[in-house]
Amino acid sequence: GRDLVKEQILVAAGEPLSFSQKAMEIEGHALECRINAEDPVTFVPSPGTIRHFHQPGGPGVRVDTFAHEGCDISPYYDSMIAKVMTHGRSRPEAIGRMRRCLEMMVVEGIRTNIPLHLRILDHPDFVAGRLDTGFMERFLAPRATGGA
């Protein structure tokens, strides 16, 4: 792989990238879901103590977290408790791995946005990769008006 941090520092210093765009090859697809301690509908923080915690794993899966059973989640700091990342040979494979991971992940004692991520993974535009900066606003609009 490439050292992206090194490349970002080079660009910030006004230097060119150490490789050309033509030298880049796409090798699969990756996704990341940020798991937050918040209500999946209202986005209100959900502080408390994690009573039970299980993180997923397996090929093409990475989880970065500080969370564990007995961990106290404060209302005074960032609500992110984990990042779940998946990689697959294709977008459908990466999405399938992410779905499996989110379904396997257990966080009891607080609410999380895992149900929201699962709904996003099912959305036809997300599945097809038809995304833009307005996706979430459109995705959440039916809830704001009392719909789906």
Model-identified regions with their sequence ranges:
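ATP-dependent carboxylate activation and anion-phosphoryl transfer catalytic cores
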Residues: 1-148
